[in-house]
Amino acid sequence: GRARGKNPNMGSNDERENTLNQLLTEMDGFETNSGVIILAATNRADILDSALLRAGRFDRQIYVDLPELKDREDIFKVHVKPLKLAEDVDISFLAKQTPGFSGADIANVANEAALIAARKDKNAVEKQDFLDAIDRIVGGLENRNKVIKVNEKKTIAYHEAGHATVSWLLQHAHPLLKVTIVPRGKALGAAWYLPQERQITTKEQLLDQMCSVLGGRAAEELTFGQISTGAQNDLEKATKQAYAMVTIFGMSEKIGNLSYYDSSGQSDFSFTKPYSEKTAELIDSEVKELVENAYTQAKALLKQHQEQHKQVAELLLEREV
């Protein structure tokens, strides 16, 4: 049901288009009194062909969003019913720890917590088992046996402490949940946040989030006078967010209130940008300025609170958590 392209070079009689045309024909061919109701589901409604959504076809749409706090509580109650829970398990607390989780994710948390408790020969599933299960699903399997050199471990500790310190000091950054230097999956360390479930996000909130993301690299440069490849994922996040701010949300003074986001799904068939080369250069310049400003702010905050940053890093190294 993907939207048909307007590019003449794509060919108008490919199999996908034939299938779509046949589907449209079949939907138009039912008798009005036949009592046939057609249901369909997709997670990419934005790229469906407009002919599918016209009156008499898929003309009623129900948007099913990810569960919110109360919904997650109810889903948790369903999935923990078969489990024997310890007294310290608080369902509302678990719901608060899992923003952005789908129903399947929550079922996975309950199953994983039960497995963790069983491995430790416990009589009941405890609160810590659920927290360990959430960590495993979010960050991957813990790998304490991974060989990491002393100087590398120190770099990781100061990097993660940088994220923690900067996000703690920023008004609009997501609240810090946990920071670790224990390798999980491909990550050598991680700082996890508890995103607030907002319906809209302001420019100040986005800038603070970007500053928090760059706190790790800023900490490396300030502490050791050099930078490493450990910030690759952070840089990717910051760059994507900056491009979104400039090209989608119209948050750049020089570009103005323009959005180059194509919600029709037609852009996949087009090889041209909807703006000139001069504008492309201006976008790149604005993105670079946003990222550099956030990085400068992160360094300034860490320089100002150097002692606290050091305390967090040394605590991570000491306890190896």
PLM segments and residue spans:
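Flexible beta-alpha connector loops of hexameric P-loop NTPases
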Residues: 1-18, 61-69, 83, 100, ...
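Conserved catalytic/switch belt of AAA+ P-loop NTPases
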Residues: 1-60
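Generic recognition of well-ordered alpha-helical segments
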Residues: 22-25, 74, 78, 96, ...
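Conserved C-terminal "switch" segment of AAA+ ATPases
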Residues: 31-37, 50-51, 64-131, 136, ...
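Soluble catalytic regions of large protease machineries
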Residues: 151, 155-158, 164-321
